Amino acid sequence: MSKGLPARQDMEKERETLQAWKERVGQELDRVVAFWMEHSHDQEHGGFFTCLGREGRVYDDLKYVWLQGRQVWMYCRLYRTFERFRHAQLLDAAKAGGEFLLRYARVAPPGKKCAFVLTRDGRPVKVQRTIFSECFYTMAMNELWRATGEVRYQTEAVEMMDQIVHWVQEDASGLGRPQLQGAPAAEPMAVPMMLLNLVEQLGEADEELAGKYAELGDWCARRILQHVQRDGQAVLENVSEGGKELPGCLGRQQNPGHTLEAGWFLLRHCIRKGDPELRAHVIDKFLLLPFHSGWDPDHGGLFYFQDADNFCPTQLEWAMKLWWPHSEAMIAFLMGYSDSGDPVLLRLFYQVAEYTFRQFRDPEYGEWFGYLSREGKVALSIKGGPFKGCFHVPRCLAMCEEMLGALLSRPAPAPSPAPTPACRGAE
């Protein structure tokens, strides 16, 4: 038998597995989007309900600005990139959500600071002294511009982006956070991560903005890479502004899912920059390292928090399994495999995806449970709340469906020619 035949059979089997996952992911994306379209739209005031029980019933009508922005972004991205989602109902809901944000998100217009929580009809309830409501507001406006062509949305996005950059790099006083003498000058990884995500968002197919924010993107990547500490053996969630480890629990804190999400943000940056050396570093430190330290050897799934010195983490939910770290891990491993071809990363994608689909998805009512015990049992039956909306699950499924489709569209390698039998006269 030709030596090339088993290899060809292996490749065909791999393609069958990729195709099966593409179909499985696509069907799940349809179910998840249908859940949010059926249960979350506020037809009276615009925007979205995110506090939804298992069956989709609204248990609280407060509106969280960052989740409003995420859902607008998600709907517009689906509308733009998938033919089956290109229908008026989805875009109209996104526009209604965008208009709700334009009217009510900012606490004291023309100031840019956004509320964290609004009443159903848009009155501010709470403000956070962070940049995250504003970041998702920016993402929403940019995607609305891309989906509708209405320039006013893009103007809003760029103005808010420039305000965020000012807060982060020049003067944070506008966030309202007091400078306390005993507080360490800490940099959470979330800040450069979020900015890098915005750089990618605004620069997509836009040479002018890509050029404007190119230096910022490099700055963000450097700041994220500073979180690799202890001679490359740990990625820490918080470091000093100078890139050094901080003392105490804050300094030892690790979040494997967040590191994996940072990993695929950095991978996109590497791909755009054409930097294979950085890509290899990112795969090693931001994909493989957090997975091997963060995967529960007894019950499967990723721990939510860890302590770099193996003390018991102080967060009560540290051992729980949450939906979003697993969504981000699926994206990270599939993106890493798509770019590097390393079969180890594909096997890890399958491992995480099998666990995630088995434990989190709700085959009866749709969408995914968000909060499981360490053993993988449902701890909270809600499908949405102050921190879970229409974002991590559909973003994961949409990106994975696209990446799986791209892998399947690649031509299969040509089989190696069979060796020519040696001539007996030459023996």
Curated annotation (Swiss-Prot):
Activity control: Inhibited by N-ethylmaleimide, 5,5'-dithiobis-2-nitrobenzoate and iodoacetic acid.
Listed pathway(s): Amino-sugar metabolism; N-acetylneuraminate degradation
Effect on the protein of changing C396S: Activity is similiar to wild-type
SUPFAM superfamilies the record matches: Six-hairpin glycosidases (SSF48208)
Matches recorded under Pfam families: GlcNAc_2-epim (PF07221)
Region (Leucine-zipper): 195-216
A GO biological-process term: carbohydrate metabolic process
Keyword presence, Hydrolase: no
Catalysed reactions, as listed in the record: an N-acyl-D-glucosamine = an N-acyl-D-mannosamine
GO CC annotation: cytosol; extracellular exosome
Disulfide bonds: none
EC number: 5.1.3.8
GO molecular function: endopeptidase inhibitor activity; identical protein binding; N-acylglucosamine 2-epimerase activity; peptidase inhibitor activity
Keywords: Isomerase
Outcome (variant: C312S): Activity is similiar to wild-type
Stated consequence of mutating C114S: Activity is about 26% of that of the wild-type
Described purpose of this protein according to its UniProt entry: Catalyzes the interconversion of N-acetylglucosamine to N-acetylmannosamine. Involved in the N-glycolylneuraminic acid (Neu5Gc) degradation pathway: although human is not able to catalyze formation of Neu5Gc due to the inactive CMAHP enzyme, Neu5Gc is present in food and must be degraded.
Family: Belongs to the N-acylglucosamine 2-epimerase family.
Name of protein: N-acylglucosamine 2-epimerase
